[in-house]
Swiss-Prot record:
Protein name (Swiss-Prot/TrEMBL): Tyrosine--tRNA ligase
Keyword Iron: no
Keywords: Aminoacyl-tRNA synthetase, ATP-binding, Cytoplasm, Ligase, Nucleotide-binding, Protein biosynthesis, RNA-binding
Subcellular location(s) of the protein: Cytoplasm
């Protein structure tokens, strides 16, 4: 199966230029292709995964991937299908983000061997280009009429009170020139990107043809949508980042575990490197079993292993199991740090707090009366163990102090997992 056929079978091609010619070229020879990543934050998020993984798929098929980090274009920001003008970031901020993203892209690709990946930065050519050269050598090849007719531009112009600045309007010229420059430097003949990049990609194809008289191609990947219509890649806490310091491996694992049945088999095709035959077999087995599908667990394991590695996957599984177990002794200090980052609602507490106060403080009970009821019915656990009276000498006027949280409840001298019922947790972080 060719790489194009594999992408098609996974539903990963939204648009492409001359797919027959592209498929024939890929079968005849090994090519160089690229995808650009503008630094809009200090980390990539799961919305970047499809193009990143597509580069990897092409490399596995023997082609040379080029990961282009937009050190120059990131200073402007892509206006494509954005409702309003982007805020401009300082050169120092963008430079820091460029380095972070370069480091994140590196593990996905192999930089050794005959088709070693290439890391590029468009600041290398735009940084030395002056305004006159840009307007004379690049600008003359772009029709303003054609640029105004691009859907992404028309939407901004037609939106009341929006409009578009010349800075953002000129963005497609910069991205278009990236293709021409990478064609000249590295022989790149294919640009891939998200479906919102079609206009920018075709601009680059046209410019490369005009400047170098070369036939080049473009391919876009689909916009990832969920069956319920909500945006993919967002949680109540915001974006799901690929940086473990921004989204913990545990939370990342949980994100994939919670994928809806209606989406999970599509996402296995989109995001994993399991074969179509393996995915079809998983789906058939799930449907035949009549019980809880295995697909979400497989998806969560594949993605966490791919992004964070085996150790992080083991930690995510250990945390997931321990939260509902009586014995939580297997949790490491690093596991608790993940929970404190984003795994559980975390609350700072001080010595002297009793379990009733802790339940109310964390929102696991709405009042002291309700909290006492939970404690009396044995529905409250501290680190997996039932909360029990441990302070027989408490003051008569403070009956709730019968169960004080103290040193025996502190894991690593800092953490306590408070649980009410089967699925309601909070993390107490001791000052």
């Amino acid at each position: 199966m060719s790489v194009i056929q594999d992408l098609q079978s996974r539903g990963l091609i939204a648009q492409t230029t001359d797919i027959e010619a592209l498929d024939a070229l890929l079968n005849e020879q090994k090519i160089a292709l690229y995808c650009g990543f503008d630094p809009t934050a200090d980390s990539l998020h799961i919305g970047h995964l499809l193009p990143v993984l597509a580069l990897r798929r092409f490399q596995q098929a023997g082609h040379t991937p080029i990961a282009l980090v937009g050190g120059a274009t990131g200073m402007i920001g892509d206006p494509s299908f954005k409702a309003a003008e982007r805020s401009l970031n300082s050169a120092e901020t963008v430079a820091g983000w460029v380095e972070s993203i370069r480091n994140q892209l590196t593990p996905f690709l192999s930089f050794e061997g005959g088709n070693a990946a290439i890391m590029a930065n468009n600041a290398d050519w735009f940084g030395s280009m002056n305004c006159l050269d840009f307007l004379r050598d690049i600008g003359k090849h772009f029709s303003v009429n054609a640029m105004l007719n691009k859907e992404s531009v028309k939407q901004r112009i037609d939106r009341d009170g929006a409009g578009i600045s010349f800075t953002e309007f000129a963005y497609s010229l910069l991205q278009g020139y990236d293709f021409a420059e990478l064609n000249k430097r590295h022989g790149a003949v294919l640009e891939i990107g998200g479906s919102d990049q079609w206009g920018n990609i075709t601009a680059g194809i046209d410019l490369t043809r005009r400047l170098h008289q070369k036939q080049v191609f473009g391919l876009t990947l689909p916009l990832v949508t969920k069956s319920d219509g909500t945006k993919f890649g967002k949680t109540e806490g915001g974006a799901v980042w690929l940086n473990a310091k921004k989204t913990s491996p545990y939370q990342f694992y949980q994100f994939w575990l919670k994928v809806a049945d209606a989406d999970v088999y599509k996402f296995l095709k989109y995001f994993t490197f399991l074969s179509i035959e393996e995915i079809d077999a998983i789906e058939a087995k799930d449907k035949a079993s009549g019980s809880k599908p295995e697909a979400q667990r497989i998806l969560a394991e594949e993605m966490t292993r791919l992004i964070h590695g085996e150790e992080a996957l083991a930690a995510a599984q250990r945390i997931s199991e321990s939260l509902f177990a009586e014995d939580q002794s297997s949790l490491t200090e690093s596991d608790f740090e993940q929970l404190a980052l984003d795994g559980l609602p975390a609350f700072e507490v001080s010595d002297g707090i009793n379990v009733v106060e802790a339940l109310v403080k964390t929102g696991l009970a709405s009042s002291n009366k309700e909290a006492r009821g939970f404690v009396n019915s044995k529905a409250v656990l501290l680190n997996g163990k039932p909360a029990e009276a441990n302070n027989p000498n408490h003051a008569a006027e403070r009956p709730d102090d019968a169960c004080l949280l103290n040193g025996e409840h502190k894991r690593f001298g800092k953490y306590t997992i408070l649980r009410r019922g089967k699925r309601n947790h909070a993390l107490l972080v001791w000052k």
